[in-house]
């Protein structure tokens, strides 16, 4: 058996005929597969046992040798080696072709590699290969040119004129092979380099392409004539199996059909050659052989694909690699695993944070081998076989053993789709009755799970290492923070929030108001026996030990707050304990809602770490559920109070709208202005009605409580329930100017209802499209950044990246403190007012420091950033900064690339799909939401392009009747820009503008930014633009994730002049290779290469990665492999 598991790199190359014969165990001579009577493989056929090995373990074909004791003997009668049948998965055969044929990948791909090597167009090459024209191989003394094409008539004339011996011409792959053999790579390479120095334009591009191909062959020690195939390898039979179906029929892999066609045609050609058949017949047979081999390698690439029964194209070798069902994505990147199960989930509020309920039968099946081993060890059964029988019959002793086995063996729970790493977490299993998995309610947010029939899968980590990883890294109690922004993901929701909110409410004049209790316990007891109301204002005496001394004091509170604070550590920093008299105050003395719960959990995590936080969360969960039940908060129609003022407000607006219409009819205002004003009026009215409504609602109104606490619903939903629904959009997204006046409480009439359905339908369609788009974006992001890993502690980079707050107009999108937290400073940060050093160079900035810096009024700061990291593979820990998921410094080996891709991709489904139609006469559509993110990451030219100034200067606006022109007056030159009709200007006369600033509204083309502002400018632009989209949707993503991806997009340099280096002009090289090569050239006193950084979209960047396996598994599989094989690429298997 061929075992190969420990290797560091993979190389791919062209296979020479010798190599193929070396791999092979024998030649396949017949197209037969298996004998229809005996169902045994035919000798010398496609399933031959002599070539590929026995079909049954330790048994030869004729049955002379059976049993293991004959291992390794080759049978003297049938020639089959006695060995395991598993060898049929790895032994290869070959077919000796009677005439050479070309490999379609190298002849047909773009650019055609064969065409480049011979300097011929693919069309003329095709004529020669498929026997339509002759090609002159050696003109000798005749005036014919080498590689000249001749048709039948010209060929005959040439023979008449110069005789048969006068020149050599031929057709088919043989002739091409001869020409390829003649190529002297070193000589051609020299000639091309000389020619390059003088050429320009299209010619230069063609030369560069040829040089690239020639250099690939020269460096990789592949021979160009190996692109022509003399011998075809036959892949092992178990990779193209033939299986018997129930009806006695056979199903076979398409490859067998394709191989059979090749063998049939090859044998016929051999026979024809032996018989000395006329040229034209042989030629036809050769062409058919060429076509058969093409179909085998890549069916459908040239001409019509070969079809099987039912007109279905057969799957060729290339198709076996391509696409979601191909070898890469189906078998190498994702496999199905055993020791797994799936079932429906139900809520388990009684579980601890780190537990999950596992159904008994499922657990028994999953842990079967462990249970069997324990049964034998404990002497309950004598051997494994009887233990297995015990488990299968489910005898009573088995359950006790199962409990024992399960006790310290974590399991992994996963819910599809797994959008980020919190989609798989580890839990301690608890056996439950029934057949459903029980899930802790707090981890639902991370899984995005609910209990309306969702299913989850259970996996079992087997090895000790896997169990340790599950326990220490993946346990749900350790995964409290989101890797994308470092905020808690385990925030209580719905009932838990409502219960906590209810507990911390207070009420005037409640039963027992003003009473004084000697201790919290007494107060709580008084509440439990019904003496006082849970919301009553009371006074309580509290005594605490501070620094070994007892401190007493009386505080104002409510029984509810006392109960809530029992579960909260009293040192989280909500109360300043250093102030005298504050020692005994309650930590949480405010009304709890969803956002304050988030803050609470965050503070607890930062102060006490995950374990204590998970305990606190469990307590909050229990109290929340308990008190939301006791509060008995229900919803009824009487809770929706329609405000009195609504009628009056609607009547007033009607009058106003009529006035506007009148003005329009009299021609004072345009149609567009009228429309805008009407919309504005109704929007204002809707808001006024909503405000009236909110004023009317009682603090204890159940609907108000649900919305106010953040448990469910929002102000806008209450507005629709009891206020008015307001303006709706029609299917194209334009707002209909007639509002829906009714609320749901009053009921909609038919036309109102109809208008409402537009939005709902569009919403559903959008969601479906969005999910697919978002998933594809994530996949591209993963592919581009998957090899970014923290490789070293400090790369020693001296340059920093300058950051400031991100603004959109007057609105701060991302404050400076958020951008600073968890980073290292690249310079001393000095307080502009006092001049003291706030943060030293290379110092770590935590949350408190960051806020201090922001308050001091510093506007711009240089920090260590992934952008300026000098690590060649991956990044260093200092440039990356804090690990968002643990709030600690990042460890070496952490795969930050994948985390970045997931953090950007996972919220993708929350972004909107629509392009907003901006108001105004000629408002251009500004792309937003998911399409905008995609546009930025793919570095496309955006819709609604803005005009950008190329230089620094002042603005002058010239307006004539025909057009507007903006002139930028710089120090040395002035540039004028014509403004297209309908664009909105962002500048006015006399403004001072700097290079790269927008003159009109819209989106800037990132390639322009790169040209004008340089690499740092474009990095900053991409980062802040993507942030704007996400932040406007209320999604927080930390900068560093975007930095990782953008860095991958700006890693390549396009060579402009190669100097004395190995690079070829026009090629893309990695920025680090570029610097290394140039440094080497400088040392030796040679001329260095010149190039400029290019911006690649994520798809291109993923395909341009150094690892050909990564690119091949991503997209365009055949193209990537063709290229890699010629270059003889080595994949170092990093990442």
Curated annotation (Swiss-Prot):
Q: What is its EC number?
A: 2.7.7.6
- Write down the Gene3D superfamilies for this protein, in alphabetical order: 1.10.132.30, 1.10.150.390, 1.10.1790.20, 1.10.40.90, 2.40.40.20, 2.40.50.100, RNA polymerase II, clamp domain, RNA polymerase Rpb1, domain 3
- Top-tier EC class: transferase
UniProt GO cellular component terms: DNA-directed RNA polymerase complex
Please list the residues that bind Zn(2+) 2.
Answer: 795, 869, 876, 879
GO MF terms listed in the record are:
DNA binding; DNA-directed RNA polymerase activity; magnesium ion binding; zinc ion binding
| Protein's UniProt keywords contain Nucleotide-binding | no
Cited InterPro entries? DNA-dir_RpoC_beta_prime (IPR045867), DNA-dir_RpoC_beta_prime_bact (IPR012754), RNA_pol_asu (IPR000722), RNA_pol_N (IPR006592), RNA_pol_Rpb1_1 (IPR007080), RNA_pol_Rpb1_3 (IPR007066), RNA_pol_Rpb1_3_sf (IPR042102), RNA_pol_Rpb1_4 (IPR007083)
A Pfam short name:
RNA_pol_Rpb1_5
Q: Which residues bind Zn(2+) 1?
A: 60, 62, 75, 78
- Give me the residues that bind Mg(2+), please: 450, 452, 454
| Family under the similarity heading | Belongs to the RNA polymerase beta' chain family.
Matching entries from PANTHER family are given as: DNA-DIRECTED RNA POLYMERASE, DNA-DIRECTED RNA POLYMERASE SUBUNIT BETA
Its recorded name reads DNA-directed RNA polymerase subunit beta'
Query: Which organism does this sequence originate in?
Result: Clostridium tetani (strain Massachusetts / E88)
């Amino acid at each position: 058996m061929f075992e190969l598991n420990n290797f560091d790199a993979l190389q791919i190359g062209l296979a020479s005929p010798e190599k193929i014969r070396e791999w092979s165990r024998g030649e396949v001579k017949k197209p037969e597969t298996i004998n229809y009577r005996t169902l045994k493989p035919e000798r010398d056929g496609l399933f031959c046992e002599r070539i590929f090995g026995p079909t049954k373990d330790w048994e030869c074909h004729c049955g002379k040798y059976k049993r293991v004791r004959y291992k390794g003997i080759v049978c003297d009668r049938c020639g089959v080696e006695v060995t395991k049948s598993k060898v049929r998965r790895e032994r290869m055969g070959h077919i000796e072709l009677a005439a050479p044929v070309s490999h379609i990948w190298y002849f047909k791909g773009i650019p055609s590699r064969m065409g480049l090597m011979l300097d011929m167009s693919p069309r003329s090459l095709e004529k020669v290969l498929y026997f339509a024209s002759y090609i002159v191989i050696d003109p000798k003394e005749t005036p014919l040119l080498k590689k000249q094409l001749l048709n039948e008539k010209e060929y005959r004339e040439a023979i008449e004129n110069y005789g048969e011996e006068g020149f050599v011409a031929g057709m088919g792959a043989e002739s091409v092979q001869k020409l390829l053999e003649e190529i002297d790579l070193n000589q051609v390479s020299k000639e091309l380099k000389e020619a390059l120095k003088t050429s320009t334009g299209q010619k230069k591009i063609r030369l560069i392409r040829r040089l690239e191909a020639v250099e690939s062959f020269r460096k990789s020690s592949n021979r160009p004539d190996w692109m022509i195939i003399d011998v075809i390898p036959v892949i092992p039979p178990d990779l193209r199996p033939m299986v018997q179906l129930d009806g006695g029929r056979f199903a076979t892999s398409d490859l067998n059909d394709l191989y059979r066609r090749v063998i049939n045609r090859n044998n016929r050609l051999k026979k024809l050659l032996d018989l000395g058949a006329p040229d034209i017949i042989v030629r036809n047979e050769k062409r058919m052989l060429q076509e058969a081999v093409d179909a085998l390698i890549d069916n459908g690439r040239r001409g019509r694909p070969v079809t099987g029964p039912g007109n279905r194209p057969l799957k060729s070798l290339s198709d076996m690699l391509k696409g979601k069902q191909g070898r890469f994505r189906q078998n190498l990147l994702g496999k199905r695993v055993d020791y797994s199960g799936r079932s429906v989930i139900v809520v388990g509020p009684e579980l601890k944070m780190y537990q999950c309920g596992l159904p008994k039968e499922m657990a028994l099946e999953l842990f079967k081998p462990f249970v069997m081993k324990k049964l034998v060890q404990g002497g309950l059964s004598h051997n494994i076989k009887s233990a297995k029988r015990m488990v299968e019959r489910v005898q009573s002793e088995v359950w006790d053993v199962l409990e024992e086995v399960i006790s310290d063996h974590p399991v992994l729970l996963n819910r599809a789709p797994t959008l980020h790493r919190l989609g798989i977490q580890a839990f301690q299993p608890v056996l439950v009755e029934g057949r459903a998995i029980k899930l802790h309610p707090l981890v639902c947010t991370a899984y995005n799970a609910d209990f309306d029939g969702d299913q989850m899968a259970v996996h079992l980590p087997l090895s000790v290492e896997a169990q340790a990883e599950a326990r220490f890294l993946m346990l749900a109690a350790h995964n409290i923070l989101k890797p994308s922004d470092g905020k808690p993901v385990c925030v209580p929701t719905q009932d838990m929030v409502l219960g906590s909110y209810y507990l911390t409410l207070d009420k005037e004049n409640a039963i027992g108001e003003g009473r004084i209790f000697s201790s919290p316990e007494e107060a709580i007891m008084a509440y439990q026996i019904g003496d006082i109301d849970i919301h009553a204002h009371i006074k309580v005496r509290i005594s605490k030990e501070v620094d070994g001394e007892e401190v007493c004091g009386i505080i104002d509170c409510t029984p509810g707050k006392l109960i809530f604070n029992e579960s909260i550590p009293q040192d989280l920093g909500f109360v300043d304990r250093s102030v005298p008299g504050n020692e005994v105050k309650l930590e949480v003395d405010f009304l709890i809602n969803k956002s304050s719960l988030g803050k609470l959990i965050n503070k607890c995590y930062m102060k006490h770490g995950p374990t204590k936080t998970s305990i606190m969360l469990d307590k909050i969960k229990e109290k929340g559920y308990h008190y939301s039940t006791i509060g008995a908060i229900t919803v009824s129609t009487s809770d929706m109070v329609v405000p009195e003022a609504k009628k009056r407000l609607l009547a007033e607006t009607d009058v106003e709208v009529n006035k506007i219409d009148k003005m329009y009819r009299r021609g004072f205002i345009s149609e567009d202005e009228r429309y805008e004003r009407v919309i504005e009026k109704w929007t204002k009215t809707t808001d006024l009605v909503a405000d009236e409504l909110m004023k009317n609602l009682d603090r204890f109104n159940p609907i108000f409580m649900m919305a106010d606490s953040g448990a469910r619903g929002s102000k806008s939903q209450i507005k629709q329930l009891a206020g008015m629904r307001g303006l709706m959009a029609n299917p194209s997204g334009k707002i209909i100017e007639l509002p829906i006046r009714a609320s749901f409480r009053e009921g909609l009439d038919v036309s109102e209802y109809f208008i409402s359905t537009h939005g709902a339908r569009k919403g559903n369609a959008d969601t479906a499209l969005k999910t697919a788009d978002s998933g594809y974006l994530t996949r591209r992001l993963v592919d581009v950044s998957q090899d970014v890993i923290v490789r070293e502690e400090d790369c020693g980079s001296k340059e920093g990246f300058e950051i400031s707050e991100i603004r959109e107009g007057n609105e701060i999108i991302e404050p400076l403190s958020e951008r600073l937290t968890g980073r290292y400073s690249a310079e001393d940060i000095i307080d502009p007012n006092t001049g003291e050093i706030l943060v030293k160079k290379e110092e770590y900035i935590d949350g408190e420091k960051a806020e201090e810096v922001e308050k001091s009024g510093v506007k711009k700061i240089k920090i260590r950033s992934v952008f300026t990291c000098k690590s060649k593979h991956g990044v260093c820990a200092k440039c990356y900064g804090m690990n968002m998921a643990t709030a600690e410094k990042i460890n070496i080996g952490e795969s930050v690339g994948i985390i970045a891709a997931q953090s950007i991709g996972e919220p993708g489904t929350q972004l909107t799909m629509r392009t907003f139609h901006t108001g105004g006469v000629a408002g251009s559509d500004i792309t937003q939401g998911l399409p905008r993110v995609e546009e930025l990451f793919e570095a496309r030219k955006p819709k609604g392009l803005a005009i950008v100034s190329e230089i620094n200067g002042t603005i002058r606006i010239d307006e004539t009747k025909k057009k507007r022109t903006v002139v930028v007056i710089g120090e040395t030159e002035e540039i004028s820009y014509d403004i297209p009709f309908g664009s909105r200007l962002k500048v006015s006369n006399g403004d001072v503008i700097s290079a790269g600033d927008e003159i009109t509204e819209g989106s800037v083309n990132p390639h322009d930014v790169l040209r004008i502002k340089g690499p740092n400018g474009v990095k900053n632009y991409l980062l802040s633009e993507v942030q704007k989209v996400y932040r406007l949707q209320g999604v927080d993503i930390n900068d560093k994730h975007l930095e990782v991806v953008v860095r991958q997009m700006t890693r390549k340099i396009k060579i402009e002049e190669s100097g004395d280096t190995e690079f070829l002009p026009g090629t893309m090289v990695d920025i680090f290779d570029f610097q290394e090569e140039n440094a080497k050239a400088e040392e030796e006193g040679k001329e260095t290469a010149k190039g400029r950084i290019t911006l690649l979209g994520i798809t291109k960047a993923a395909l341009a990665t150094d690892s050909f396996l990564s690119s091949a598994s991503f997209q365009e599989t055949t193209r990537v492999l063709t290229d890699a094989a010629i270059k003889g690429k080595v994949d170092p298997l990093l990442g």
